Amino acid sequence: MVCEKCEKKLGRVITPDTWKDGARNTTESGGRKLNENKMLTSKKARFDPYGKSGFATCRICKSSVHQSGSHYCQGCAYKKGICAMCGKKVIDTKNYKQTSV
């Protein structure tokens, strides 16, 4: 659950740049340099799931949050009726019997 204010942050489309702007075969865009040893530099660009990333832990259940910029996981946000990103109350869950299963 995300409020209307935080929904604008999610509205970005995750697509690569156009070919000329972010082409991989140019050195100015951060691509590989000429005669670069790929074995030495590939360790920095590799994805590390347990390392320091943009994902935090949920403030309620302390589990991993699967959305960057969020403070609450989707299960806790649904149960409490709050926004997963900012924690603002979205719906009143007083008369609901909600489960996250």
From Swiss-Prot:
A GO CC annotation given for this chain: cytoplasm
Alphabetized UniProt keyword annotations: Cytoplasm, mRNA processing, mRNA splicing, Spliceosome
InterPro entries (UniProt xref): PDZ-binding_CRIPT
Pfam families tied to this protein: Cript
GO terms of biological process kind: cytoplasmic microtubule organization; mRNA processing; RNA splicing
GO MF term set: microtubule binding
Primary residence: cytoplasm
UniProt-annotated location(s): Cytoplasm
Subunit structure: Component of the minor spliceosome, which splices U12-type introns.
Family that this chain belongs to: Belongs to the CRIPT family.
Biological function: As a component of the minor spliceosome, involved in the splicing of U12-type introns in pre-mRNAs.
UniProt protein name: Cysteine-rich PDZ-binding protein
